[in-house]
Amino acid sequence: MVEVVRNKRPPRGLVPRLRRALAALMEELGVGDKGVTVILTGDRRLRALKREWWGEDEATDVLSFPHYEPGDPFVPPHLGDIWISLDTARRQAEARGASLEEEVLVLAAHGLWHLLGHDHQKEEDWEGFRRVQERILAL
């Protein structure tokens, strides 16, 4: 199940597509029976969260907060929360020549991949992120 919380108004049609595409991606990744919450908000909130949890005083596009430790034998019914800044997503979409809807889908897939225990500390770690980010756009 994909729950979407709107702290900032998204474009019309984004929320239903986000729910459908993220749920389909979760199914493909074998976690279709789990839940996630996506919070659509702005730069100010993401900056505050990043400062509180990472000690970095800057806005960002997406943050993931898992509700379990990846690698634990028990994966709870709710994987965690994905926070997306619509402000940063809009700027990134414009820079890439993409729509805001596409950028939010890419960020949601990126956040989900983090919730599943993946990181991108090294260049070779990015392959999985690229794969899920491309896949969600096709769903």
From Swiss-Prot:
Query: Per the annotation, which location comes first and is thus the protein's main one?
Result: cytoplasm
InterPro entries the UniProt entry points to: MetalPrtase_cat_dom_sf_prd, YbeY
Q: Which Pfam families match?
A: YbeY (PF02130)
Q: What stretch or stretches form a coiled coil here?
A: none
Give the record's cofactor note, including how many are bound: Binds 1 zinc ion.
The record's EC number reads: 3.1.-.-
SUPFAM superfamilies from the xrefs? Metalloproteases ('zincins'), catalytic domain
Q: Where in the cell is it found?
A: Cytoplasm
Asked whether the keyword Transmembrane is assigned, the reply is no
One annotated GO molecular function is: metalloendopeptidase activity
Alphabetized, the UniProt keywords read: Cytoplasm, Endonuclease, Hydrolase, Metal-binding, Nuclease, Ribosome biogenesis, rRNA processing, Zinc
> What residues bind Zn(2+), as annotated?
H110, H114, H120
Q: Which cofactor does it need?
A: Zn(2+)
Cellular-component GO terms for this entry: cytoplasm
Q: Which biological process, per GO, is one annotated for this protein?
A: rRNA processing
Q: Which family does it belong to?
A: Belongs to the endoribonuclease YbeY family.
Per its database record, what is this protein's job?
Single strand-specific metallo-endoribonuclease involved in late-stage 70S ribosome quality control and in maturation of the 3' terminus of the 16S rRNA.
What this protein is called in its record is Endoribonuclease YbeY
Encoding gene per record: ybeY
